[in-house]
Amino acid sequence: MFKRFIFITLSLLVFACFKSNKKSIKSDKVVVGVLAHGSFYDKGYNQSVHDGVVKLRDNFGIKLITKSLRPYPIEGKRLLTVDEAMTEDAYEVQKNPLNLFWLIGYRFSDLSVKLSYERPDIYYGIIDAFDYGDIQVPKNSLAIKFRNEEAAFLAGYIAAKMSRKEKIGFLTGPMSEHVKDFKFGFKAGIFYANPKLRLVSKKAPSLFDKEKGKAMALFMYKEDKVGVIFPIAGITGLGVYDAAKELGPKYYVIGLNQDQSYIAPQNVITSIIKDIGKVIYSISSEYINNRVFKGGIIIDRGLKEGVIEIVKDPDVLNNRLVDEVIDLENKIISGEIIVPDSEYAFDLFKSKL
């Protein structure tokens, strides 16, 4: 009887240990949240994020929670400010047992600091963060910035060499000050190739109006007489491709975030590839594998790190121009060319040529 009691007791202990172990394995599953401003299927910025986190899910079996900010003003909550609405959406994602939380876009810069201090149990990553200045990045947070001006310089050089007109177009959303690194890098590339060319800059009132983007692009091509347009305007920017296709193969576009030549094969002369998904995948996979998160810092990425690059298709450009772009690329990586990211830096850049 005593032996039977011992056997049953041991069996229960083994079973209990098995159940406990099974539970701990389940709790070890990493949960990653992603909050973005706009659709994850924008064929550009957010699409790159989406591709990176889906690859992460498929390769590591993580639980992935994605959410797009609700269009503002929010129906039924019109008294909410933009910041309050963003915070509500972030809290909604944080109802899940998150390990990592990625906030996509400069709009989340201030919010990421607030959330990090409120929830020290979650690790945060902010893509395209503001310059925090004297503000210390929290230990459980990581700010990632990109040297967008480097690839924009190469795009500007290509635009100047390919344009059949004396003007180049630059189309942004309503908050254009947040893409000034793109603008002045692009402007510097144009100036480096041909100082006589002029940059025509326009601001769209929204990032979500494709028809407005098309109308503005048609005006820029036909009335402003630009030969190339570089749009940084979200969904609105996709309207530029429609306008270029409608007008014909002599009207050029520069793609952004992904190789966008498939959208308008006869019009896209190059694309800036900004592989945000690659950065998110790299940092997240390091955490998943080692349970290590190196927070409290700002990470800077550009051409040298292979995160940003420019498409150099010899069938579109020509071999000579491709060689010139590769040479400029190497000079930027080596530091021989310092690309400006502001108006002051651009004026300094011009003075040294």
UniProtKB/Swiss-Prot annotation:
One of its GO terms (cellular component) is plasma membrane. The keyword Phosphoprotein does not apply. Residues 1-16 form the signal peptide. It is found in: Cell inner membrane. Its main location: membrane. A lipid is attached at C17 (N-palmitoyl cysteine). The keyword Transmembrane does not apply. PROSITE patterns: PROKAR_LIPOPROTEIN (PS51257). Keywords: Cell inner membrane, Cell membrane, Lipoprotein, Membrane, Palmitate, Signal, Transport. Pfam families: Bmp (PF02608). A lipid is attached at C17 (S-diacylglycerol cysteine). It is a lipid-anchor. Monomer. Belongs to the BMP lipoprotein family. May be part of an ABC-type nucleoside uptake system involved in the purine salvage pathway. This is Basic membrane protein C. It comes from Borreliella burgdorferi (strain ATCC 35210 / DSM 4680 / CIP 102532 / B31) (Borrelia burgdorferi).
